Every structure is written in structure tokens, then in C-alpha cells.
């Protein structure tokens, strides 16, 4: 990680993963616990020339590192095609820390952030 304000994800320590994942966040009703599920389609960490073992997903930013060891490969026709990682938190403080990382990661990757309330989107068309 070259820049202190940059947030990155690594599967191999010291090697930033350039593929931007799809991320879904879920929380318990009381807000204390939850998960973020990351899906990386065709990540460079799965490239045939990479010989290192993936031992976890490492999320690094100016505050330090968040780690999950829950990383699974998805295979299509016997070939690795995606990585799915699940980061779990067990307190409001852990959730807030994760969200600070997520905002920095979105900013570093040029992404937007949207919050789905679970409600159906409003329609622009009239019923008539």
C-alpha cells in the first residue's frame, strides 16, 4: 500500500488485488453482528502464474488491517473463476470500523456507495 489514505484488498500479502468485488452487507436487527460478503470475479490472485496459497483476505487502510480467513473458491468446469470472502463482525464498533474501511475502499477504487433499505424502488411511471 503506497499511499496512507488508500484502502486496498489483498489475498497475497503485499500484492494488491486490482479486481473490484461485488460486496453485500447484512446486519442483525439489533445492529451488533453482521457480515460483508465479497465476490471477486476472475481475481488476479487466481491467475495460473500465481503459485502462492491464499490464506485469507486482508483489508488494509490508514487505520490498519482487517482480516478474514473465510475465503472460498468458485469453480466452473474445473477452473477457478471467482473468490468469495466473508468478513463477520460481532460488535457495533467492529461494524463502524468495517464501514470506514468500505468508504475508503470505495473512494480509492472510484466506486459509488448505495444503501439498499430492502424496500421496492419508487417507480417513475404512472399507473394510468
Swiss-Prot record:
Residues 111-128 have a biased composition (Polar residues). InterPro entries: Psb28_c1_sf, PSII_Psb28_class-1. Residues 109-128 are annotated as: Disordered. It is a peripheral membrane protein. Pfam families: Psb28. Belongs to the Psb28 family. One of its GO terms (cellular component) is photosystem II oxygen evolving complex. Part of the photosystem II complex. The lineage of its organism: Bacteria, Bacillati, Cyanobacteriota, Cyanophyceae, Synechococcales. It comes from the Bacteria. It is found in: Cellular thylakoid membrane. Keywords: Membrane, Photosynthesis, Photosystem II, Thylakoid. This is Photosystem II reaction center Psb28 protein. One of its GO terms (biological process) is photosynthesis.
